[in-house]
Amino acid sequence: MGSNSTAIPTTSVAELKYLSLLARDYPTQAAAASAVISLEATAKLPKGTEHYISDLHGEDEAFIHLLNSASGVIREKVDLVLGENVPKAIRAELATLIYYPARKLPLLKARYPERFELEAWYRQTLLRLIDVCRFVSSKHTREYVRSCLPQGCGHIIDELLHAHFEDHNKTLYYGQIVGSIIANDRADAFIIRLCELIKRLAVDKLHIIGDLFDRGPRPDLILDRLMTHHNVDFQWGNHDVV
């Protein structure tokens, strides 16, 4: 009679070496499988936007505008999200608010001297910013988006980004969150943080291609800004040679 025994798979010395390294981060089969599932799912997400800027030549104001507007990407996202439901002038205004929230916000608020008018504008603006932020976050995993959330109010923004407004009970819940933000005089802070988050999520990586110095007045301000960017690479140009 033939043997019914099942052959036991063997592992080579080389395989054991790599398995032992893998086990440091993934000590169980379940942990390794979970990581594979997550990575395979992430690979199916759209590629993040990469922003290329060259020939800065010390022109700090022009550079800051390119950075804040992502060379038109932010306005494009605003138009895609709000579409024909919002007039073109209002969409342009919202895009400018995203570019320069601290500078633009006081100017927009000054149009509404009455408290009830200002509160209505706050609510509308917060909801529109949440819609834009939700759209630009769709290229990223929820874990990555959470890592970008500002401290202090990140959990509230996370709730609003994953709102399901088709659920009546949740609609009341999210409406109460926005109302509480306004009632507790936190609307300005949330607007500014949402604007910064939109800019952060809209561009995955920034590439600076040469010629930072020469001609312009403040290349140092450009360097200062680049030092705070979340993901940038840099190539020196011939004008940067001392």
Located regions from the model:
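Feature recognizes metal-dependent phosphohydrolase scaffolds
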Residues: 1-242
